[in-house]
């Protein structure tokens, strides 16, 4: 025995030295890591609380907390493990063998344990001192408090103590049973050490055999034999689940319990002093990540995510690392401290989230409400002005109440409808804040409303002034006024929408002025003077008014003919007068249409076309905007606009569908109306237009893009101006004659219809293009050369011709034509999408060879849109993205072209087979 005692003393002294040196290492290396990881463990719990599928809904929160290695176990990380000092830590060490790595220090721990059991005094003196040094001095375990915690809870303690420890005990026993096979491994420890440990641990086992059915004995065997074996040591980063187990040993055997407590404290102190390997930490982190639902995450990424979330818990957890809870009242304070933390993050954090989100959304809504309030006030002002106009005219319009409803209500409706929609979208009951965000852009701000209100007043008041002149024209037009009303309302909607979205107030004013000028066609000379004055005021627009008036006039005359044919000429003059006066109210917006259409080539039908020019007006408006942007206003682009534009307008959100369809049909008769001897100057232009239209393929491009820099364009514009002046002169004469002789319009319509069929054939293909994008691609490429020649685009013409030659087959690299000059400006071609595309590139050819499912291609294209929306993206990346997107659009465009050609071939074959 004396030899054994001496050996044990030597071992203890050597182990003390090793422990002291290791303690320093621990403080320097592991303590920092353990403390940081302790914060991260707490953050894991917080993440679990905040996770989408909150674990509390699926698992018992007490079990979840402990099973995550948090509540009591994480305190050990801070270096102040209180509960681990209790005897069942043997079981925990066994449990944790799964997570830790074998180290040579385990032999030291085993020897220390044997020495402890041999002499309680040396064990108590040295190891208690070690424990106090390693662990915080305040950490004195109170056996009286600990002994009551495992399976029964006194009334004075928190009720969560029992479920916490008991559930953890159950989990540990199950896990230890699974690990029992590994417990048989031999460490290479001397039998003496094992015997000594057996003696000391038999005392411990006596108290536990009753409760745990020798599971703890198995655990002890694991811990004992695992000292020098490959069985991994318990991770010092986690405290045992059954930390309070040995308290009940104290009830039965006070001496043995004190020995076991001291022994456990000593063993834990040694474990704590052992430097923690990275593998220990990583395994612990993986375990935590698995329990937190963050599976398959390596320790580094997990630690990063936890450090991100650490801001939540650092303020409250750091000043009191969970080890401090342990210090005197482990039973009560630990459970309650955990419940406090859990309560904060499980309840308060979600509540705070639910509170903060409504606050933010309510702030947003209040912001929208302010806008809505402003817009409503503006609406009221606008409506008041409209009501005044109505009151002035109601006396005249008693006979036409229906028309008043049709016109006045839609006149107001654009504001109301959009505002109501925005209110519904941004109402507090809106589904999400995304809706509110986008509604913010949809809604009209007070500034927009002010602009619209000012424009409304500016438009409507002068209409009254010109009632006399308009009446002169309207008396001669019986049925046209009926068409004017819906068109006027449509124009109001369109103009308002244009203003609301584009905010081009100057353009709207200009067009309204042009409308006034064209409306009063009886006084065309006076109107021209006014136009000249306004054109002087608007220098930027002066360049385009004559051209667009010409183009509009042709369309308006067409519509007038339609109106004459559609409307009954037998209506009484009194009703005509009333309708005239009423139309004057809303003609302000239709005015451009009337003027543009009546003054040009269709002088005979220009006066009736005033009412029906809504769609034409919208088209003219679009063409003007395009002209202002691109600077191109040749005669032929106008003609092209007159034809396909009505159909595009038919699909566009601005125009009335019926009117636009009619204009499609009538636009060519209108354009041929000037074939009368009166309009010889306009005949030449229309012949040109007819030739162009005949040369066009069946499907015309939705948009014709041309360079604004070409000199030929300027020449055409000058010629168009001259011809438009001739038109205006001839149309004035013709307008007067037609105002006197309304019947001529019918004859003109008949002539135009007789002459129209060739052009109508071309136009019938235009609606097909607008309606079916699949058919567009073919005409796009075939029609590109035609437009290039028509518009004489110097830079864009050659590429357009080239693209038009592309065959309806799978593209190859030979089809790609590189520009002659390295940095020449981008050349565009018309596409089936309604907007121009750059020329074919190698990327498109490659995409043909590697086609993806269409849903994948669409998803990639949408993603590229999202990426482009990132303002922080570099310029090069933006260019690459846009190049890819254009290449994809070229791919789709050409495939549509191929499909259309194949479809045409099938139809031809069917036609051939039928006869």
Swiss-Prot record:
Keywords: Cell wall biogenesis/degradation, Cytoplasm, mRNA transport, Phosphoprotein, Transport
Transport listed as a keyword: yes
Polar residues composition bias: residue spans: 115-125, 696-710, 752-793
InterPro entries the record matches: Zds1/2 (IPR040206), ZDS1_C (IPR013941)
Pfam family name, one: Zds_C
Compositional bias segments (type: Acidic residues): 243-252, 515-530
Other information: 'ZDS' means 'zillion different screens' as both ZDS1 and ZDS2 have been found by a wide variety of genetic screens.
Full protein name: Protein ZDS1
The organism of origin for this protein: Saccharomyces cerevisiae (strain ATCC 204508 / S288c)
């Amino acid at each position: 025995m004396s030899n054994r005692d001496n050996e044990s003393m030597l071992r203890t002294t050597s182990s003390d030295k090793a422990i002291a040196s290791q303690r320093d290492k621990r403080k320097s290396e592991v303590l920092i890591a353990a403390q940081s990881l302790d914060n991260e463990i707490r953050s894991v719990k917080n993440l679990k609380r905040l996770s989408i599928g909150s674990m509390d809904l699926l698992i018992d929160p007490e079990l979840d907390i402990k099973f995550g290695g948090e509540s009591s176990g994480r305190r050990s990380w801070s270096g102040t493990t209180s509960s681990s000092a209790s005897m069942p830590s043997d079981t925990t060490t066994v449990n944790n063998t799964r997570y830790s790595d074998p180290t040579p220090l385990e032999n030291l721990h085993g020897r220390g344990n044997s020495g402890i059991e041999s002499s309680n005094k040396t064990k108590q003196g040295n190891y208690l001192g070690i424990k106090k040094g390693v662990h915080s001095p305040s950490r004195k375990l109170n056996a009286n408090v600990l002994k009551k915690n495992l399976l029964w809870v006194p009334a004075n303690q928190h009720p969560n103590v029992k479920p916490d420890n008991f559930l953890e005990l159950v989990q540990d026993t199950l896990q230890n049973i699974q690990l029992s096979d590994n417990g048989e491994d031999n460490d290479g420890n001397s039998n003496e050490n094992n015997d000594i440990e057996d003696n000391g641990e038999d005392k411990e086992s006596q108290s536990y055999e009753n409760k745990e059915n020798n599971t703890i004995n198995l655990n002890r065997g694991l811990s004992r034999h695992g000292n020098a074996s490959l069985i991994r040591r318990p991770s010092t980063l986690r405290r045992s689940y059954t930390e309070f187990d040995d308290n009940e040993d104290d009830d039965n055997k006070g001496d043995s319990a004190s020995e076991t407590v001291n022994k456990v404290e000593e063993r834990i102190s040694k474990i704590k002093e052992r430097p923690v390997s990275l593998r220990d930490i990583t395994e612990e982190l993986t375990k935590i990540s698995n329990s937190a639902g963050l599976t398959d995450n390596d320790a580094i990424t997990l630690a990063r995510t936890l450090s991100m979330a650490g801001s939540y818990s650092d303020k409250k957890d750091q000043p009191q690392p969970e080890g401090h809870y342990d210090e005197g009242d482990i039973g009560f304070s630990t459970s309650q401290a955990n419940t406090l933390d859990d309560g904060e993050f499980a309840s308060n954090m979600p509540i705070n989230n639910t509170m903060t989100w409504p606050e933010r959304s309510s702030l947003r809504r209040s912001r929208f409400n302010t806008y809505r309030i402003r817009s409503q006030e503006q609406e009221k002002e606008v409506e008041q002005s409209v009501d005044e106009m109505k009151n002035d005219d109601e006396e005249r319009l008693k006979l036409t109440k229906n028309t008043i409803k049709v016109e006045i209500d839609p006149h107001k409706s654009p504001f109301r409808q959009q505002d109501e929609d925005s209110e519904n979208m941004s109402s507090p009951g809106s589904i999400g804040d995304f809706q509110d965000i986008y509604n913010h852009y949809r809604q009209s701000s007070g500034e927009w409303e002010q602009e619209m209100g000012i424009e409304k007043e500016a438009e409507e008041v002068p209409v009254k002034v010109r009632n006399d002149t308009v009446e002169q024209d309207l008396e001669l037009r019986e049925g046209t006024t009926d068409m004017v009303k819906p068109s006027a309302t449509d124009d109001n909607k369109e103009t308002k929408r244009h203003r609301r979205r584009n905010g081009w107030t100057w353009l709207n004013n200009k067009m309204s002025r042009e409308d006034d000028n064209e409306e009063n066609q009886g006084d065309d000379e006076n109107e021209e003077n006014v136009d000249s004055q306004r054109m002087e005021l608007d220098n930027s627009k002066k360049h385009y008014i004559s051209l667009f008036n010409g183009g509009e006039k042709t369309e308006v005359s067409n519509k007038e003919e339609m109106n004459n044919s559609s409307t009954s000429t037998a209506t009484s003059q009194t009703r005509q007068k009333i309708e005239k006066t009423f139309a004057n109210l809303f003609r302000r917006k239709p005015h451009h249409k009337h003027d543009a259409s009546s003054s040009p080539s269709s002088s005979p039908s220009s006066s009736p076309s005033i009412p029906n020019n809504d769609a034409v007006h919208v088209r003219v408006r679009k063409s003007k905007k395009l002209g202002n942007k691109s600077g191109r206003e040749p005669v032929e682009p106008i003609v092209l606009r007159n034809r396909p534009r009505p159909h595009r307008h038919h699909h566009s959100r601005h125009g009335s569908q019926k009117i636009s369809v009619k204009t499609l049909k009538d636009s060519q008769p209108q354009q041929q109306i000037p074939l009368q001897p009166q309009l010889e100057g306009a005949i030449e232009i229309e012949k040109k237009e007819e030739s162009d239209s005949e040369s066009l393929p069946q499907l015309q491009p939705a948009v014709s893009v041309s360079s604004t820099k070409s000199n030929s364009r300027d020449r055409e514009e000058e010629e168009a101006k001259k011809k438009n002046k001739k038109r205006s002169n001839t149309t004035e004469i013709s307008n007067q004659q037609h105002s006197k002789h309304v019947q001529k319009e019918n004859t003109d319509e008949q002539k135009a219809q007789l002459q129209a069929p060739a052009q109508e054939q071309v136009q019938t293909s235009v609606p097909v293009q607008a309606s079916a994008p699949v058919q567009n691609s073919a005409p796009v490429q075939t029609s590109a050369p035609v437009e290039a020649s028509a518009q004489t685009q110097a830079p864009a013409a050659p590429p357009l011709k080239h693209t038009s030659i592309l065959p309806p087959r799978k593209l190859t690299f030979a089809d790609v034509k590189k520009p002659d000059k390295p940095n020449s400006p981008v050349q565009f071609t018309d596409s089936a999408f309604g907007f121009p595309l750059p020329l074919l590139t190698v990327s498109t050819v490659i995409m043909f060879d590697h086609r993806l499912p269409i849903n994948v291609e669409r998803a990639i294209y949408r993603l590229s849109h999202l990426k482009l929306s990132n303002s922080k993206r570099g310029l090069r990346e933006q260019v690459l993205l846009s190049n890819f997107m254009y290449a994809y659009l070229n791919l789709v465009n050409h495939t549509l072209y191929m499909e259309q050609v194949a479809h045409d071939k099938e139809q031809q074959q069917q036609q051939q087979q039928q006869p």
